[in-house]
From Swiss-Prot:
Binding site for Zn(2+): 889, 891, 900-901
Catalytic activity field: ATP + H2O + cellular proteinSide 1 = ADP + phosphate + cellular proteinSide 2
Protein localization: Cell inner membrane; Cytoplasm
The protein's name: Protein translocase subunit SecA
Binding site for ATP: 89, 107-111, 502
Zinc is among the record's keywords: yes
Amino acid sequence: MVSLGVFARKFFGSAYERRLKVLRQKVAQINALEEQFVKLSDEQLCQKTDAFRKRLSEGENVDSLLPEAFATVREAAKRVYDMRPFDVQLIGGMVLHDCGIAEMRTGEGKTLMATLPIYLNALEGKGVHVVTVNDYLASRDAETMGKIFSFLGMTTGVILHDLDSDARRAAYACDITYATNNELGFDYLRDNMAFDRSQMVQRGHHYAIVDEVDSILIDEARTPLIISGPLEDRTDFYNLIDTFIPALIPEDYEIDEKQKTTTFTEVGTEKIEKMLEQAGYLKGESLYDIENVAIVHHVNNALKAHKLFVRDKDYIVRNDEIVIIDEFTGRMMPGRRYSEGLHQALEAKEHVAIQPENQTLASITFQNYFRMYRKLSGMTGTAATEAEEFRNIYGLDVVEVPTNLPVQRLDEDDEIYRTAEEKYRAIVRDIRQAHEKKQPILVGTTSIEKSEQLAERLRKEGITDFKVLNARYHEQEAYIIAQAGVPGALTIATNMAGRGTDIQLGGNVEMRIRQELQDIPEGPERTAKIEEIKKDVKQLKEKALAAGGLYVIATERHESRRIDNQLRGRSGRQGDPGRSKFFLSLQDDLMRIFGSNRMDGMLQKLGLKENEAIIHPWINKALEKAQKKVEARNFEIRKNLLKYDDVMNDQRKVIFEQRMEVMNADDLSEMIHEMRNDVVEDLVETYIPSGTYSEKWDVKALEEELQQLFNLELPVKEWAKEDGIAEEQILERILDAVTKLEDERTERYSPEVMAYFQKAVLLETIDTLWRENLVSLDHLRSVVGFRGYAQRDPLNEYKTESFELFQSMLKNLRRIVTSKLMRFEIIQQPTEPSMPEQTGADSSVFNDQNQENAPPLWARSQENRFVNPQDRDPNDVTTWGKVGRNERCPCGSEKKYKHCHGAFV
């Protein structure tokens, strides 16, 4: 019997089919305009941009411009590059405009498709960010697609890692900006560490299109972007801890490859304790005593570095440095470092220079960064397997965009062998057969080590004409990929995700022109050579097609089905023929971790002989089930990370908004006044609680606090003896005294100097306390999980305690800022120029490069001048010169300088 759901789908169509139907109707509207737009001159087509902007300014909705705007871009692409976007690309463009994820097969033209919604949304004048995975793709796409936008009167900028602030600011000011996800995130963090608005580079987060969206928003979601500063050097300690691990035997520790964790057994813990005790580092009796928390952390990192992290798979050693390898793409990630001491443990393991640990100055995850955009969309070749995560976390629906031509690639069943040795023999045999008929072959491996092992096997078998593409040789990446579709080409590559360059049968025309004609100037000779190259590529493509198209061989299944699909998708682009096959063994990581012992026993019972493969749908289903388990686990990890990061993100928003308010304010006196009153009220409430008798008042402590914070000596003790006096009256008298002191101080300096000093103190204090708060939150996060053993929800505990930390930080902020502003003295050298005006980013005061090592204006004083103590006037701080921290304060208080006027210097 047919279910109601099946009947309804047959009658009404699925949600996907209904959505496609609506999009195809819009495509028909765009196509109907084509004849009209073809007749326009170049100038008339360019003028469409101003006409659209005018209509928007008059109140028209951007959605209503879509058919005309898309028709405009289509016509411009035809005139600039002789490329006419297909109907399916128009569909993909509409998905992106509607804040969805367009899943398009490799080679279907995602880059050109993106120009349609980019142009439409850039008309609003608020900036469009196009996000790529590396600088090469950002600059390539900005250069190629920028010509279309320039033709239509729009500006295009690109953010590269080596640009200075002025160049970045100019790029962000363009209508369209191409950049990597890392550069965007770090620029956002740096903007929120700036002293002045003129130092900021970004101008908001209006609309972003993320290329390879699954790589950026899924694979990298677990890694926060961190700007950090160095802590003390502990090289000797890391090297010492590293010497302990080789002395351990397998019984001393346990490894969980599924969860990627390591733990010491009881025997192993005793061994480590003895070694630490002999080295003089163990405090108390046990490694797990509270005094040894930091040591436990470092010992665990050393164990992880040796037992979980594999050289040439997880990282490589290059130029005396540990360089992380992206597990999903096989790319090196220079500049990235593991946090919390793990990177230092790896450096000690490999005996390279150990860099100091860093303190977090600012951080954000990609999840929270990209959720700031008012409109967010993405495109990729593989997103369907992660559709639930995109919907739950980012509110993005995945739409599979139909291919322009039917896919002709043959995806063959997996071949499974008992051992890795048998598997590699079969792979080499298959490669030889395909190579002999000149079929282009792409072999995908999961690590550098395995790609080089396969390369060595091929050499021993007499096959030497191949290219290896992995993190070691990434500089040659684009050229190797460009030639991977040539007849007879054999390319061995680590994971292909995010490579960004299509494998075109016959070779890549543009790449060959750049390589072969770089020294030939424009002219008849160059034109003739270009035609020769095009003709040659066309002939080579015909040979590659005759050989069966690109053959993709995978040597292992990845944890994620998406990565496997990306590798398959390299073949069969734009309707070309091709084939793909996975060769597996029970010794592969995925099979070994997820229960291959049971499978091995079954295969033995079935009588599987050496060098025999088994091909069975049941095994494919078992593999897919294992992959789904890993994907679900990783999703839970990312979802959990987001829950904790959301707590920090709420605090981050408050702090960054507060900083922005301070930076933008011309007059901060009202904010300072409120802070000062809050501090005084808190003090009075602490030492003279409302509703209590005077006998309970601690007026002596209140007097000391007032002296410490405000440098005010007030007779609070005498006031408290007055008949019938209430705490409100004492509060009022203190506020009057503080206000009088503040007014006297304000009169001594110009409004410009006061405003500058107030801003400097506020921003410096906010940044310092926020850094300390981040450290506290990290520590809280690392231990809060143990609350689960006490039947308490770790997340709720984290929320509660992080809120208390935040409240404490804000209270400290008010106290420190108030005290600094009530106690400061600005001492200006006679030769010091007058307060300069801000003239923009190049002003000598506001330019980071010019002022890199100089103290801010308010801190430049005669404090380094040594003065005879007899020549110091207690009432004139300008006569004190340099005062030692432990000297008696020259003011006459008899306190040490560091506890009096030097408390906040």
